[in-house]
Amino acid sequence: MKNVHFLPWVGSKYNIGWQGKRLMIMGESHYCASLKDAVPSITHDIIADLFDADSEHEAYKNTYTKFMRSLTGHPLSNEEKREAWNRVLFYNFVQEPLTGPRKAPTAEQFRGSDTAFFEVLETFRPNCIIAWGKRLYDNLPRCGHQLNDVMAPDGKAIETWAYETRDGHAVQVLPIMHPSAAFSPDYWHEVIESFLSRQRNLKRTFTTYLHTSIRCL
């Protein structure tokens, strides 16, 4: 993965998966106060710190806690956090560090990270991706397949997408609200469960839920 600077966290049970599927969680970017902090292992180090009993609590960890509650459907003990994170892959899409905590990546930074993203898909072959935030989802590569929507508990339709690896392996994508601020774990748990239930038969899903396709150039 020569274009990947920020290496993903890959849980020790990733290939066993979540509900039997390889699940990739995708954030947008890393904020680094100093460029010397932008090391390749930063993603791995952040996730490992979440269930380190000796690590002090910091406010940013609430984001990861709320997301994992939306995935599991309940609060987790420290050991349950370790088990859950070891069943998934976590990757931040943008491969350049941002220099401000509320600074958005530029269009060039998003597009400059496309090749690395596809390298991750080819290497780790997730079955499904949960993407954090509308801005990230709207800036993902727009080649691939638009699938039918997932319906939220309040009747809202949530668009889903899919990519294919070079050998035709399907990777489906669900965008969720970024799990910070006004994020309801219970609401998004229902959405995620609806999405994951479509993964039981990927061939049937692709033919049944396919909406439109855009060729990857």
Predicted segments, located by residue:
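C-terminal capping/extension of enzyme domains
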Residues: 3, 104-115, 138-217
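Extracellular/periplasmic catalytic domains that process cell-envelope and extracellular macromolecules
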Residues: 16-20, 82-83, 123, 166-169
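A Trp-anchored, charged/polar loop motif used as the substrate-binding/catalytic surface
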Residues: 2-15, 65-77, 109-119, 156-158
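Short, surface-exposed acidic-centric catalytic microdomains
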Residues: 36-104
